[in-house]
Regions:
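Key DNA-contact positions within bacterial/archaeal DNA-binding proteins
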Residues: 20, 31, 59
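A short, Lys/Arg-rich alpha-helix, primarily the initiator
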Residues: 1-18
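Short C-terminal boundary/hinge segments that cap the last helix of small helical domains
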Residues: 55-69
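Recognition helix of helix-turn-helix/homeodomain-like DNA-binding domains
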Residues: 28-41
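Short, basic-rich loop-to-helix N-cap that marks the start of a DNA-contacting helix
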Residues: 39-52
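The alpha-helix within a helix-turn-helix
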Residues: 12, 23, 51
């Protein structure tokens, strides 16, 4: 399985923010933002900080992509 952060990227567009703004607002490292851009897993703490700052739920930011067998 893979993870998609497309919901988060859409939220950023709606809030007129970019990834650099997100990193600064949530105190995230560039490496964490890069991992998310590549669809890699990040910690629940990171998702919690983002959700709290942007006032959104996990499901609004992240979706699971099921891969074929």
């Amino acid at each position: 399985m893979k993870v998609s952060y497309n919901g988060l990227w859409k939220i950023l567009i709606d809030k007129n923010m970019n990834k650099k703004d997100l990193a600064k607002a949530c105190e995230l490292s560039p490496a964490t933002i890069s991992k998310m851009g590549r669809g890699e897993f990040v910690s629940m703490e990171v998702l919690f900080r983002i959700g709290t700052k942007l006032d959104v739920d996990f499901g609004d930011m992240v979706s699971i992509i099921k891969q074929g067998k």
